[in-house]
Amino acid sequence: MIKKELQFLRNLVKKQVNEYSVIFINGDKDYNGVLSGYLEEYEQKEIDQKLSLVSNNYYFYNNPSTFVGDIILNRIDLNTYPTFIYSTAQIGLDINRRSFIPNFSSLYNIHSLSSGGYQLSLMQNKYHYYQLAKKFCRIPKTYIYRDSSFDFSKIEQSKKWIIKPNLECSARGVKLIKDINELKNEVIVASNIYRQDILIQEYIVGREIEVPILISKNKVIALPPIKVNKNFEYLSQEIIDTEKYSFSILQGKICANLQKTAEEICTNLEARGLCRIDFILDSEENFWLFDIAALPLISTHSSCYVAFRDIFPNDDSALYEAIIGAGLSWLV
């Protein structure tokens, strides 16, 4: 059933390959000093190449300012075909960092292949989406440190805790605290570095599972859950940056429940395009929401790529065609 639904989206692309435009907008980590969520150069080049192969009218910008200027000065034809953007660019460092380009583009009837500006901001804010998702699944006990008025005495000393910046991704600033006596200092240090709220979250022992979700006009499609294979207690910034982990397809009856829950969360958040819901699966097969990726990585070393490869072996275009097809579905 999943393959049939994805193939329908791919067929939209194959039938209309000359009748739409795609603009990929990136901004490297030096563009405005972003702390996380940027693409490495080799990832950007891979995505650029593969998007260009599934659109006959294709543009790439590695500077969001140049894109904005070209639109304002009418240097891109927006009238002949529907135009889509796939933007990984970030403007600024606050919660709206990913929203500027989609919001600006909507003024010119350019359609986003990801969620809209509001949803991107919502899914940037971990503490808020935990509150919205807790009616669908378990959430680890979570406190939010905003300033020095926080009462550390309420933290249970018998547990291990994870600290993480509220607005960052890619494990930026994530740290496992085993000694409760170090917690306060580590939180204050993180707050000073990242200049944002810091989450203090109960550490759940278990396997990390990622569930890619593709949202089209008429369907929320949960792909096969992917297991993160690692020899570490958790994915830290260093492990992610050096890719010291791999992916494999999760097996077992729990998969259907994970997929259903991931679909419910994305529907509740009104997400669009490709998203990813990350869980921790404990020894009793209880699953806990760990993270939400509004713009998950789609290069070769990613759970999204592995999920599509499982459904469409040896077909590198499948993932990219499905993303564009989901965008086209809203115009049919």
Where are these regions (language model features)?
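Short beta-strand segments
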Residues: 25-26, 164, 201
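ATP-binding N-terminal substructure of ATP-dependent carboxylate-amine bond-forming enzymes
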Residues: 1-112, 118, 128, 146-153
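A conserved helix-loop-beta module that forms one wall/lid of the active-site cleft
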Residues: 102-175
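Flexible, glycine/charged-enriched surface loops at secondary-structure junctions
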Residues: 200, 272-276
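C-terminal active-site "lid" helix and adjoining low-complexity regulatory extension at the edge
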Residues: 281-332
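Amphipathic alpha-helical segments that line or abut small-molecule/effector binding pockets
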Residues: 151, 256-263, 317-328
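Phosphate-binding site of ATP-dependent enzymes
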Residues: 180-260, 281-288
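A short, flexible beta-alpha/helix-coil linker loop
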Residues: 28-32, 167-170, 243
